[in-house]
Structures are given as structure tokens and as C-alpha cells.
Amino acid sequence: MSGQSESIAAIATAFGSAGVGIVRVSGPLAKRIGETLTGQSLKARHAIHAHLRDGAGDILDDAVVLYFQGPQSYTGEDVLELQAHGNPALLNAILRECRRLGARDARPGEFTERAFLNEKRDLEQAEAGADLISGQSE
């Protein structure tokens, strides 16, 4: 494993309003961030429904929350997925809370980079994923 010491976070769904939007966190703080936002204990590969709360205790949204313990995750690190309503302002508020709790903004492609560095994806798979995401044709 690459031994990444920083936790990263990003909105993982396309920009714009949608029924569901996902905020993803990867790194050593992922579980703690999830437990702080939900007020619940998280178990690996177990989905929960929870209110996500900000630092003042106010409810941000209802969400489905999934925690994947590394190395059994996409990046090979601890990963948190917060599946909330897809309002961009709401997703940005959730992302702000993740930053407040210690994660930094992920660079474009950084989740896949970590997957590659942790030998969860080979170069061909990483490049194919990037091509799929940036593709403009059918």
C-alpha cells in the first residue's frame, strides 16, 4: 500500500441536480468522519440510513452511508460513501463538513491514482476509467 497519510474527499457524482449525489472520502480519517457525521458506529460493508449533521448538530440531510475498510475498497484505503440527495448546494455542505473534520479536497483522478498506487487497479484499468469518465461519444 502507498501509505497515504491524508484523507481526501470529493463529490463523486456529475455536477448538477439529481435524485442522488455521492460524496466519497478515502484515507485514514474516513471512518471517523462518517461516525462523526452520523453519530453512529460504522461497520465495514454494511449500509446504514442516517441523518448527516454539521458541527452545530443541525441536520444536513438523510443519507445512505457505506464504509469500506481497506484494503477491501476501491482505493485500497478506508473509504466512506455518503449517498445523499443530489442538490449541489447540499453536496457542497456535506463536502465542507468532511473538510472541517480533516479531509482535504481530492485532486481530479486522485481516487483512481490511490487505487493504482495501492495495486487495486493496473495502469490499463486506470487509463480506461479515465477515458470512460472523460469520453464525449457513445
Segments from the language model and where they lie:
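A glycine-rich (often HGG/GG-containing) alpha/beta subdomain
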Residues: 1-138
